[in-house]
Structure formats: C-alpha cells, structure tokens
C-alpha cells in the first residue's frame, strides 16, 4: 500500500502566508520508515525580535531559530527530498495516497504551495 502520512510545522496558522519550518512524512504501517527535515522559511524583516520562528511557534513546536540556522535546508531541496522519499518507498504499480490530520484546511495547502514553488524554479 502506498499511503503516506504528512505533517508540517509552520511559522503560523495561515497556510496562505506562513511558511513551512519542518517536514515529516512517514510510510503508513512502517514504524521506522520516515523522513524529516527542517526548512528555512523567509527571514523576518530586519529589526524583528526573531529571524525565522515567532516565539508562540517556538513554544508550540520547540523549533528555534538556532535549529533552523544550523539544520534548515532550502524549500526547493526539502520539496525534492520529500518527493524522493515518497517515490523511493512506493510501489510504482499502485496509486500514492497522502493523508494528514488537517489536510484540506492546512497541510495540503502548504503542500500545494511547495509543489508550485518547486515547479516554477
């Protein structure tokens, strides 16, 4: 079965204006088979109290600017790696299903934005 569970951590709750800071994707039914990556979002304007991650999101996720600076990768690289993980762990003869807890109102909107930005580059 080609079912994958997708979860994003983001800089806020608006999927149209905020950015992804962490990707987690896991093949359903395979406990130790997953992919995660920190993603560098757009920097905040000069003079902001933080570079990437607002304090309320740090409190919620535990993800800090330091973690993003040291381990974050470009959005295009993160998107490529996410798709590579899915393709490498799929049976090419069967459809791929991607599920998410808040898919239609949150994660899938970010997912679509990432795909569109990747294709445009």
Which residues make up each language-model segment?
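Conserved non-catalytic scaffold segment of RNase H-like nuclease domains
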Residues: 1-116
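Short, intrinsically disordered, charge-balanced linker/junction segments flanking boundaries
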Residues: 117-121
